[in-house]
A protein has these predicted regions:
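Short, flexible loop/turn segments with low-complexity composition
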Residues: 52-63, 245-248
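Thiamine diphosphate
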Residues: 8, 24-26, 32-34, 41-42, ...
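Generic enzyme active-site microenvironment
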Residues: 16, 94, 150-151
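Generic detector of well-ordered alpha-helical packing
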Residues: 19, 96-97, 154, 246
Length: 255
């Protein structure tokens, strides 16, 4: 049977706090404490000294190059590089353009604590209402910062009604919808599982901007990096929720 040394680096101790006896019994390494994780977390927070948080390091420099003439439609790196030039430093990123997450992290990185939100895996349609939740939470806490939702056109269809709530409350959200006219992540999974050609994964003909206007949002279609930069700046000062729709090249997800 493998021992602790096969899973943990030398000198590392692992303590698991769980309310599930089965999970505690199944732990391969370390010790398990059976109890209320929420109560334990509150007690642990009381033990953390003020000022102990380390400074977030700057992102590592990476050799990057975009084409001198922007593509048509734009590539996700071109979209993210454009947004990186005009995004306010305190802006929040809520990401559910799942196939392009790695490119977003590279070209539009976040370095401030509490400024990046994304689902770990699984469900589709999380980020559109999550951006509403972040903005409402900021308002309740008296925090004034823009929220940027990076959403794929497929993900946007699952919970589009959330933008009605955003518009009703005049939340400072800028949704940038990457319109590649397909469920890229599902196509990538189909290839991974050796089941290509799954029907129903193409999304042609969607007029997302008109749908967004129907829910009360300000909405625009853009084609170029210049259009995107101009409309994003306008959205930051619009005083309401804006949906910017950007045609992009389909990307194979990094699974």
């Amino acid at each position: 049977m493998p021992g602790d040394d096969d899973y943990l680096p030398d000198g590392t101790e692992l303590l698991q706090i769980t309310g599930n006896p089965g999970v505690a019994a199944a732990a391969r390494v370390g010790d398990s404490l059976l109890g209320d994780p929420a109560a334990a977390t509150e007690l642990l927070l009381d033990m953390v000294a003020e000022g102990s948080a380390r400074t977030v390091p700057e992102p590592m420099a990476r050799p990057r190059e975009l084409p001198q003439t922007p593509s048509s439609p734009l590539t996700p790196p071109e979209v993210y590089a454009t947004l990186s030039r005009v995004r306010p430093p305190d802006a929040v990123i809520v990401n559910e353009s799942t196939p392009t997450t790695a490119q977003q992290v590279e070209w539009l990185p976040t370095v401030r604590s509490g400024s990046f939100f994304a689902t770990a895996s699984g469900g589709i349609g999380w980020a559109t209402p999550a951006a509403v939740g972040v903005a409402l939470g900021d308002r309740d806490r008296g925090v004034d910062r823009p929220v940027v939702g990076l959403i794929g056109d497929g993900s946007f269809q699952y919970s589009v009604q959330a933008i009605w709530t955003a518009a009703r409350h005049n939340l400072p959200i800028v949704y940038v919808v990457m319109r590649n006219q397909e469920y890229s992540i599902l196509k990538s999974f189909a290839v991974l599982e050796e089941t290509p050609g799954v029907p129903g994964l193409d999304l042609p003909g969607l007029d997302i901007a008109s749908v967004a206007r129907g829910f009360g949002c300000r909405a625009v279609d853009v084609e170029t990096t210049g259009d995107l930069e101009r409309e994003f700046k306008a959205a930051l000062s619009a005083g309401t929720t804006t949906v910017i729709v950007v045609p992009t090249e389909p990307q194979k997800a990094m699974l």
